[in-house]
């Protein structure tokens, strides 16, 4: 028996579960992955040799494809990863061959306030510590490849400043005439560091680089991470990397990684990360872990490759997308599925009573501050707040319905939830013909997710009418306005002069016609203002800038005050993470 989640922290439950987990070879054998298709990282973690495996299984029929999303979360999150793992365990309890795909946790949120993305309670993936602390090095590979592009750029700028055309020619170089004011990329690091959002580099002498403004972004927002999420084979990975625009010349020509002759080396650094990772739930179901982009500042999806493998090997494959349906699901729907060609069967919409009450609370209600205990007002029964908060749930239901998918609502149950509140939510959804599972997977594991699993199995029997929100023939400005209106609930969109100028240039060029819209926006509100709860009315989405990711083929409108480099809070997790000197194990994750 595993410890009770109510009285035991997640990391201790994980350590106990790890004493009896399957070897990676047993897990692979049960999945029909051959030994020669595994790249082991010890006894319980492996990478899959994707090229070997997929060439063998590509003609297998696809299993049922389930996407897990959520309502607008509180700063604590509402247990989407936990539900993804819990549902996988529940389907396993029902005798189904099942896997799930999740993203690798970034060290930034792990050491800050969000913690690990390993799930919690009795619905976790293991080994938890290794998963949480670097894993197999994929984020480092992305970080190193990204920063190598910046090394190539800044060193080239220095050499062009110091050497004549004749000397450059002797060294096999042509003058690119890079404009230091039009460098598109910054550096990346896998931490949340507000002090690195705006920096100046090259402050030394003639040999120390060109003096210019620069920045650090968090590694998970790198264009390379989006590329890792979206590619389907090695050829595509290399092609997309070579298309990344790092800067512009003084005459306005794009400078790519290919121009800098660094795309091959970047591909070499990314090569190990190309293969998906395999671990397990605490009940022994397979978990694919691949890619790590956030949904608010990036694409927010685990990789297409992980889903392709999971679908070919299993009857059911569960994948999760970041944050709420307004950003994570919208990007899954209109970017990931359009790129992959895969069509999901069912969407699971996760909600909690605390989040619903948060969205329906009075204006003077207590703030939820990450790192601080949840105010008791959101734990205690409050039918008035709950009823008002249902507007947020209804809005997310409407978003998913626009995709044509069947929906199962999952109430991620907490011990403080009352029967009256749970019955109210169930009745609300059932009146719309939507099944609602009251799921206790956090406390009871797969056994607590059986109702959810049963509803999902039934929903998978329906024919999917999945369709996209927009066609690529629609101008990019119109796509942004459509997402703002139909998904976020905005009245209109205001573009800054800079954003409008960039969009007009983009719309005039055919090369951008199939670039997807990937809006960077706060996850804490349907609007671009994180303080607006519920379903804001009478508001305008403000787009302050437009980023273009040529390799990932994404147009990224930046909404409101969102930053590509989060900051570290005053109560970060790193203060409670340590090493037990007697056991040699990490504590506090």
From Swiss-Prot:
Pathway: One-carbon metabolism; tetrahydrofolate interconversion. CDD domains: FTHFS. SUPFAM superfamilies: P-loop containing nucleoside triphosphate hydrolases. It is an enzyme of class 6 (ligase). Keywords: ATP-binding, Ligase, Nucleotide-binding, One-carbon metabolism. Disulfide bonds: none annotated. It catalyses: (6S)-5,6,7,8-tetrahydrofolate + formate + ATP = (6R)-10-formyltetrahydrofolate + ADP + phosphate. InterPro entries: Formate_THF_ligase (IPR000559), Formate_THF_ligase_CS (IPR020628), P-loop_NTPase (IPR027417). It comes from the Bacteria. GO terms for molecular function: ATP binding; formate-tetrahydrofolate ligase activity. GO terms for biological process: tetrahydrofolate interconversion. Belongs to the formate--tetrahydrofolate ligase family. This is Formate--tetrahydrofolate ligase. It comes from Thermodesulfovibrio yellowstonii (strain ATCC 51303 / DSM 11347 / YP87). The lineage of its organism: Bacteria, Pseudomonadati, Nitrospirota, Thermodesulfovibrionia, Thermodesulfovibrionales.
């Amino acid at each position: 028996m595993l410890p009770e989640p109510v009285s035991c922290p997640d990391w201790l439950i994980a350590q106990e579960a790890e004493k009896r987990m399957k070897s990676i070879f047993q897990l692979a054998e049960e999945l029909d992955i051959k030994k020669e298709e595994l790249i082991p990282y010890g006894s319980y973690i492996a990478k899959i040799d994707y090229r070997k495996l997929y060439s063998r299984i590509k003609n297998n029929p696809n299993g049922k494809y389930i996407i897990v999303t959520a309502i607008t979360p509180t700063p604590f999150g509402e247990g989407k990863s936990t539900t993804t793992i819990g549902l996988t365990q529940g389907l396993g309890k029902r005798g189904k061959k099942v896997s799930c795909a999740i993203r690798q946790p970034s060290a930034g949120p792990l050491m800050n306030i969000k913690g690990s993305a390993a799930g919690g309670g009795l619905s976790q993936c293991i080994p938890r510590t290794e998963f949480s602390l670097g894993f197999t090095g994929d984020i480092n590979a992305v970080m190193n490849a990204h920063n190598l592009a910046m090394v190539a750029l800044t060193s080239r700028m220095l050499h062009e400043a110091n050497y004549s055309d004749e000397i450059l020619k002797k060294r096999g170089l042509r003058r690119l005439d890079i404009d230091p004011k039009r460098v598109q990329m910054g550096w990346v690091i896998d931490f949340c560091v507000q002090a690195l959002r705006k920096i100046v580099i090259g402050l030394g002498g003639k040999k120390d680089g060109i003096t210019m403004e620069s920045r650090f972004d968090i590694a998970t927002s790198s264009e390379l991470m989006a590329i890792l999420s979206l590619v389907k084979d090695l050829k595509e990975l290399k092609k997309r990397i070579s298309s990344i625009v790092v800067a512009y010349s003084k005459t306005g020509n794009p400078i790519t990684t290919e121009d800098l002759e660094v795309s091959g080396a970047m591909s070499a650094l990314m090569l190990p990360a190309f293969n998906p990772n395999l671990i397990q739930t605490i009940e022994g179901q397979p978990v694919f872990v691949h890619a790590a982009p956030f949904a608010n500042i990036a694409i927010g999806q685990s990789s297409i490759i992980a889903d392709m493998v999971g679908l070919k090997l299993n009857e059911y494959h569960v994948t999760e997308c970041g944050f709420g349906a307004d950003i994570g699901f919208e990007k899954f729907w209109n970017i990931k599925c359009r790129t992959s060609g895969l069509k999901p069967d069912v969407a699971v919409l996760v909600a909690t009573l605390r989040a619903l009450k948060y969205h329906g609370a009075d204006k003077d209600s207590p703030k939820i501050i990450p790192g601080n205990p949840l105010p008791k007002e959101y734990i205690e029964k409050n039918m008035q707040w709950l009823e008002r908060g249902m507007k947020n749930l209804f809005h997310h239901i409407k978003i998913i319905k626009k995709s044509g998918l069947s929906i199962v609502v999952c109430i991620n149950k907490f011990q403080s939830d009352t029967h009256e509140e749970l019955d109210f939510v169930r009745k609300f959804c059932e009146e719309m013909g939507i099944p609602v599972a009251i799921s206790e997977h956090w406390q009871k594991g797969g056994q607590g997710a059986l109702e959810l699993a049963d509803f999902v199995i039934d929903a998978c029997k329906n024919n999917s009418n999945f369709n996209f929100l927009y066609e690529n023939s629609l101008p990019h400005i119109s796509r942004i306005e459509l997402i703002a209106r139909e998904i976020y609930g905005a009245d209109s969109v205001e573009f800054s002069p800079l954003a409008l100028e960039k969009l007009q240039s983009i719309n005039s060029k055919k090369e951008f016609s199939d670039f997807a819209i990937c809006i960077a926006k706060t996850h804490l509100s349907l609007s671009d203002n994180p303080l607006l709860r519920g379903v804001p009315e009478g508001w305008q989405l403000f787009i302050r800038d437009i980023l273009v990711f040529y390799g990932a083929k994404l147009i990224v409108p930046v909404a409101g005050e969102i930053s590509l480099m989060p900051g570290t809070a005053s109560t970060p997790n790193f203060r409670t993470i340590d090493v037990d000197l007697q056991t040699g194990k990490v504590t506090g994750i």
